[in-house]
A protein has these predicted regions:
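A structural signal for multi-pass alpha-helical bundles of membrane permease subunits
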Residues: 1-267
Length: 267
């Protein structure tokens, strides 16, 4: 058995990158992931703090709905969600305009990353309910004395959140950010539904086996050669897909480990 190859080559890596349109798909992925993660972080940080510290009417009901979003799979409501973004009426404004003009003002957001931005900002991004729950658990374990001292010094709720809570939640913010990046990066279902021409890297990786059927016309390799290289190409496709995530994790590992320990999640 030969453990190390005698002749090293990057052909499989090049074929995987070509078949996946790596440059275009990685740009599309970044355009989707970065703004979505930032918007989602803003929403879940505020919502988690609100559920942990403020008592208001309907709080229990809203938290129950939050848990409901964690349990219910997106496949159960994808049809109305797709229909909403196909004929987006700007949260009812387009329908209101239609009462006076006779024609509803709608726009299709399909094949645009703004679909993910809106969901992230409105608290319905990928796994937003889980992140709110995690942050709620963290904030509930935070000493009340610091917030009380800030209020005595004249800080309102928002200033207390910005000056006291956020600086002490760095590890949890990084943890939630990592979770969010990974889930958006690896998402196939929503990406394949809302994108129709240019796809992110998760869709390209899933379709790599099919794309390899056409690689012989692109790269000049014979179909028989590609058959023998298939497993190596698929492995290289997985490698170049997860490589950016691995690099990110290397730099954020310390915060991630600390955040998991302080999140209040056990089991």
């Amino acid at each position: 058995m030969v453990w190390l190859p005698k002749h090293w080559t990057l052909d499989s890596l090049k074929l995987a990158a070509t078949a996946m349109d790596y440059g275009e798909s990685i740009v599309m992925t970044l355009v989707t992931v970065i703004p979505s993660v930032l918007l989602q972080l803003i929403t879940v940080l505020l919502a988690g703090y609100g559920f942990a510290r403020f008592h208001f009417r309907g709080r229990g009901l809203l938290f129950g709905l939050l848990i409901f979003t964690i349990i219910v799979p997106v496949q159960s409501y994808i049809i109305p969600l797709f229909s909403t973004f196909t004929n987006f009426d700007f949260f009812g404004i387009g329908s209101l305009v239609g009462l006076f003009t006779g024609e509803k003002l709608t726009i299709s957001l399909i094949n645009k990353p703004v679909v993910f931005y809106l969901q992230a900002f409105l608290g319905m991004g990928i796994r937003s309910g889980l992140y709110i729950f995690i942050l709620r658990q963290f904030y509930r374990g935070f000493p009340m004395e610091l917030e009380e001292a800030a209020m005595i010094d004249g800080c309102g709720p928002m200033r207390t959140f910005l000056k006291i809570m956020l600086p002490n939640a760095t590890s949890m913010i990084v943890t939630v950010m990592l979770f969010s990046v990974v889930w958006y990066w690896n998402d196939y279902y929503l990406s394949s539904m809302f994108y129709q021409t240019t796809f992110p890297i998760s869709v390209k990786l899933t379709d790599l086996g099919t794309l390899l059927q056409w690689s012989d016309t692109i790269t000049g390799y014979a179909a028989q050669e590609l058959t023998f290289m298939r497993e190596a190409i698929l492995a290289c496709g997985c490698l170049i897909t997860v490589l950016p995530l691995l690099v990110l994790y290397v730099f954020a590992q310390r915060f991630f480990t600390e955040g998991i320990e302080r999140s209040g999640i056990v089991g």
